[in-house]
């Protein structure tokens, strides 16, 4: 998707003394789109033409994506037969993995249609970080709707001044539900080298749902 020239010299907010508003070309809009995803009001939802302030509602809609909480490992090692997954855990010292991570903080994960996987601290309710999958990043310019520049939800304030709110399209982003599982595998160290031995790791897979065919791990 191409990034549209949303704010330019003929746009709704063209007269604002701001370095990111009223410029022709796409460079300001590329930066504005990134800032919008980070919570700024680049598309002027409150109609005051201040595109550097924080939006009142930052989080995109969580539609089909279910919330998944990851805390201390708690899978069972109680088994009655050797063909059970619990037997495999017990035979490969899952108990040690569980003990070593008993204080792992609880984090809630969910995908939103702002194109991000969100990690939210389960105790404080504050977002710790968000991840934009590369495939979904390529879809983000599709939220820009040039026809909505200054023409969405037009209202008037107490003094009779026109207030226009706009302007993005609703799209599907990270629309699938995260899946979590403890896996016994060889991973990579901080230098990117493959480990020589296997160990237990908690793996989070993020399908995109209606955002597109694919997933991230």
Tell what function each PLM region has.
Residues 1-217:
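A fold-level detector for beta-propeller and closely related beta-sheet-rich head/sensor domains
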């Amino acid at each position: 998707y191409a990034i549209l020239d949303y704010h330019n010299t003929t746009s709704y907010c063209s007269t604002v003394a701001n370095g990111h508003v009223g410029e022709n070309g796409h460079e300001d809009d590329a930066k504005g789109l990134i800032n919008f995803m980070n919570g700024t009001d680049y598309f002027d939802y409150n109609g005051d033409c201040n595109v550097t302030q924080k939006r009142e509602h930052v989080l995109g809609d969580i539609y089909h994506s279910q919330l998944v909480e990851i805390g201390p490992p708690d899978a069972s090692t109680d088994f009655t037969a050797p063909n059970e997954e619990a037997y495999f855990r017990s035979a490969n010292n899952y108990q040690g993995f569980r003990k070593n991570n008993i204080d792992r903080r609880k984090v809630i994960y969910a995908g939103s249609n702002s194109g991000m996987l969100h990690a939210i601290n389960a105790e404080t309710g504050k977002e710790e970080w968000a991840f934009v999958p590369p495939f979904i990043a390529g879809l983000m310019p599709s939220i820009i709707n040039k026809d909505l520049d200054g023409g969405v939800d037009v209202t008037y304030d107490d003094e009779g001044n026109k207030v226009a709110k706009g302007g993005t399209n609703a799209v599907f982003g990270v629309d699938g539900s995260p899946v979590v599982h403890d896996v016994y595998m060889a991973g990579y160290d901080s230098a990117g080298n493959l480990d020589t031995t296997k160990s237990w790791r908690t793996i989070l897979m993020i399908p995109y749902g209606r955002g597109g065919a694919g997933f991230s791990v």
